Design a protein with these regions (language model features):
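Eukaryote-biased recognition of electropositive, low-complexity segments
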Residues: 125, 132, 140-144, 153-155, ...
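Structured beta-strand-rich core segments of catalytic domains in phosphoester-bond hydrolases
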Residues: 73-167
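Hydrophobic beta-strand segments of well-ordered beta-sheets in folded domains
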Residues: 57-60, 160, 201-203
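N-terminal, active-site-proximal structural segment of metallo-dependent hydrolase catalytic domains
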Residues: 1-108, 112-115, 172-175, 179-184, ...
Length: 203
């Protein structure tokens, strides 16, 4: 009873200690199938809804099969850094046709990549940026399955973004659910090679 009364009292006086600001987030997922674009590749078709509605403060690209898998990179979980950088440059160049965006962070597990961009106008408000990767293939040792995660805060609001590649097929529902639980429990929980943390948005 007291808890409910306290909550109601706090809610009533909320405007005295809390302010709110709307932040638009654009999130797209794309399986590029190992496609290698030119530096001038046009992505304008993806941003048609930017016109007339105001550009979003945050833009997230979740790409699958940025590079095609082979036996070597499945075992070693190697990343084609040149391909990742090329896609980051292409996306940013296209975004800058609409507003002054900045590239903030990416995280890659073989061909699964997550890119985070924000408008320059909110860069000082973006804090506590972290990135992680979680392997779920073959007992958590191989990167053929798994996810990449980026977390950050805008003011006092927390965001967590996940791009994953899990078991395929209707018969694997239980496996996928277990993988999601595993990803949730392991992300950012241990220090290691997969973890990247910075205190603020450094461009």
């Amino acid at each position: 009873m007291f808890g409910e009364q306290f909550e109601a009292a706090v809610k009533k006086r909320e405007k005295e200690f809390a302010t709110y600001d709307e932040v638009k987030v654009f999130f797209t997922t794309w399986n590029v199938g190992g496609f290698e674009p030119s530096k001038e590749y046009d992505l304008s078709g993806l941003f048609n809804n930017f016109e007339g509605k105001g550009t979003p403060e945050v833009v997230v690209f979740a790409i699958q099969e940025l590079v095609t898998k082979n036996a070597t990179n499945l075992i070693t979980s190697t990343t084609n850094e040149a391909a990742v950088q090329k896609w980051a440059d292409i996306i940013l160049a296209n975004l800058k046709k609409h507003d002054n965006y900045l590239f903030v962070r990416e995280r890659t597990l073989i061909g699964i990549t997550l890119f985070l961009f924000v408008k320059n106008s909110i860069r000082e408000r973006v804090q506590k940026i972290g990135a992680d990767l979680i392997k779920t293939g073959v007992g958590g040792n191989f990167g053929n399955k798994g996810s990449v995660v980026i977390k950050f805060c805008i003011d006092d609001s927390s965001f967590a973004l996940i791009n994953g590649h899990l078991e395929a097929g209707a018969s694997s529902n239980s496996t996928r659910l277990m993988n999601l639980i595993d990803i949730h429990e392991r992300a950012f929980q241990e220090e290691g090679v997969g973890k990247i943390r910075v205190s603020k948005c450094v461009i």
